[in-house]
Amino acid sequence: NAWDTNVDVWHRRMIEASEEEIFQAAQRTHTPYNHVYLRKNTKLEELAKYPVLFYSHPTIMTQERADLLKAYVEQGGTLIIGCRSGYKKENGQCVMLPQPGLLQPLTGSDVREFTFASPAEPAVYARWEDGMESEMPIYHDVMEIAQGAENAKVLAYYTGSFYAGRPAVIEKKTGKGRTIHYGSTFSRANVKQLL
């Protein structure tokens, strides 16, 4: 994913914004924060010490990495991913699977459309069941619950643009943990809400 950030202009725009905003939210809420780089030899024990993992925009996904993340969630972790996740192989080619590709069994989401947020339109938010709204900056995954996904539910719906009323945030429980597919980039405000 580091390679892809350097080459893919779309990905760079999202990852740079999200990483800065996750850091700022953690600092301002006094939430302990650490960077973990997933390598081929990363073990579950290394991830298990973190109750929450933000894997903001993992465009490149391997089966080994997806299996590691699944094991992390099954043992009780919370995995939060953002938009444009899991749609490429290690060689940079798109997978021939619905987005988020190899992560779909974990997320229970099916990305049906995707788009940059239009500067010509009013800002789009996600509205949660309790009426709270979250910022949805830069990019939007327009999702639905994947066919056959068990223990998945929509947490929030888009409020604007042509996809108003469509799922913006989907949660899926797996084992003792859960995965949240947040269909946008991260901001200080929405990270604070997720924490």
Give names to the regions the model predicted.
Residues 1-50, 106, 172-173:
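Aromatic-Pro/Gly-enriched surface loop or interdomain linker
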Residues 53:
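Conserved, mostly hydrophobic/aromatic
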Residues 45-48, 56-195:
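A conserved amphipathic helix/loop scaffold
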